[in-house]
């Protein structure tokens, strides 16, 4: 019996001793797969691994991350290196920029930031950035950035089909010659589950206790209790998708007065998942082609035309499947009362025969829009009056008691605004 236990113990020791090597091998394969998928999924961040030196209990790797600015098309390469520690069930990777976290001679951080990746054999990975307090000054522009320490964390599980993100930054402030801004208690939480293609379901919430804006040419403005909540949910069979975004502010403080709450809601309802996935994918491909180095070549032009055709086909399929989009709720509190409104546009679901006869997406669209503004708001504030004057002059906003109201209906490519019919041009 004693011999059996000795043999079993020896087997466990051999297994435990061999696991770091196996973990290191799996980690290298996972790293190659993740970087390949990241590069294929989008053009904005491209990862290149120049070397991966795998040892028994640890590894070293290095390469270049290339970040693309979508506005200018400029790229910035950032060389990195990392040390990998192999454990029994996973690995721990510690990343560092080769040129440091700040330019030479700059003292941006009180302590060194830490960027780590923890992986597990069963497909779970946790990427975490721990940042100390930051102080960045630009003497030439007179701008400065100050932040407290913060943390950003992303956990990926179920072979990449689920993800959770958390960002916590107690304080951020930016100041310049024209404006200064301070944000307190910034927090983001995001939970996602992959549905199909580029489509994910889940919830996300971002909040800030307060946002304070100051300018030499204007009164201070403070927004308290700012919160954004988004959700995307599929039906039981995963064929239809409902998505929504609400933005709320508890109070807005201006000139020693407080107004609130404020709320705006955006909604996408009853989307066909396959068509929506095809539309988002083809639009992403079109954007990527526009940013590609050979965007002006004949071959690139032909690929762009094909991508545009794919976008049009996906939009047509999405419309034929039926959907609703709009702003179900708008509430803004002002010194003179609330501004309220809503806007919804709907396309009915079409049969196969109706889809074959479908000439334009717009032809079947129906919609409704309502807006109500306190009349005294336009009378007492010249800036508001200037914005509303054209609508009042054309009869789009009409007096109704102590309010200015707009009531619009869309049907058969004609918009009825307070009794005035306006034909729509056939745009798409």
PLM regions and their residue ranges:
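Glycine-rich, small/hydroxylated-residue low-complexity segments
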Residues: 5-7, 15-428
């Amino acid at each position: 019996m004693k011999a059996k236990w000795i043999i079993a113990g020896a087997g466990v020791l051999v297994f435990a001793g061999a696991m770091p090597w196996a973990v290191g091998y799996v980690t290298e394969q996972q790293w190659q797969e993740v970087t390949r998928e990241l590069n294929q999924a989008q053009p904005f961040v491209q990862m290149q691994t120049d070397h991966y030196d795998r040892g028994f209990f640890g590894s070293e790797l290095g390469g270049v991350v290339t970040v693309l600015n979508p506005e200018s098309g400029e790229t910035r390469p950032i060389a990195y290196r990392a040390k990998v520690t192999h454990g029994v069930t996973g690995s721990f990777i510690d990343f560092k920029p080769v040129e440091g976290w700040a330019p030479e001679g700059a003292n941006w951080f009180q302590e060194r930031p830490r960027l780590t990746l923890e992986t597990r054999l069963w497909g779970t990975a946790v990427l975490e950035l721990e940042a100390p307090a930051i102080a960045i000054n630009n003497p030439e522009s007179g701008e400065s950035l100050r932040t407290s320490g913060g943390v950003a964390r992303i956990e990926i599980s179920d072979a990449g089909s689920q993800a959770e993100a958390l960002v916590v930054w107690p304080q951020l402030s930016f100041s310049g010659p024209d404006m200064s801004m301070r944000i307190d208690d910034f927090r983001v939480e995001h939970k996602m589950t992959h549905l199909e293609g580029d489509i994910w379901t889940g919830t996300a919430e971002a909040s800030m206790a307060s946002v304070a804006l100051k300018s030499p040419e204007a009164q201070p403005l403070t927004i308290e209790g700012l919160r954004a909540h988004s959700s995307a949910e599929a039906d039981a069979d995963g064929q239809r998708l409902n998505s929504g975004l609400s933005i709320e502010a508890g109070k807005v403080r201006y000139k020693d007065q407080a107004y609130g709450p404020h709320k705006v809601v955006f909604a996408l309802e009853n989307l066909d998942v396959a068509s929506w996935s095809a539309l988002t994918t083809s639009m992403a491909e079109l954007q990527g082609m526009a940013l590609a180095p050979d965007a002006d070549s004949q071959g690139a032009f032909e690929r762009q035309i094909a991508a545009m055709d794919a976008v049009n086909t996906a939009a047509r399929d999405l419309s034929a499947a039926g959907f609703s989009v709009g702003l179900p709720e708008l509430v803004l509190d002002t010194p003179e009362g609330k501004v309220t409104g809503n806007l919804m546009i709907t396309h009915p679901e079409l049969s196969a025969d109706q889809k074959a006869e479908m000439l334009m997406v717009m032809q079947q669209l129906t919609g409704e829009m309502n807006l109500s503004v306190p009349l005294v708001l336009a009378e007492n504030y010249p800036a508001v009056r200037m914005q509303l004057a054209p609508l009042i002059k054309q009869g789009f906003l009409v007096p109704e008691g102590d309010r200015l109201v707009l009531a619009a209906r869309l049907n058969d490519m004609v918009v009825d605004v307070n009794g005035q019919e306006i034909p729509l041009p056939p745009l798409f």
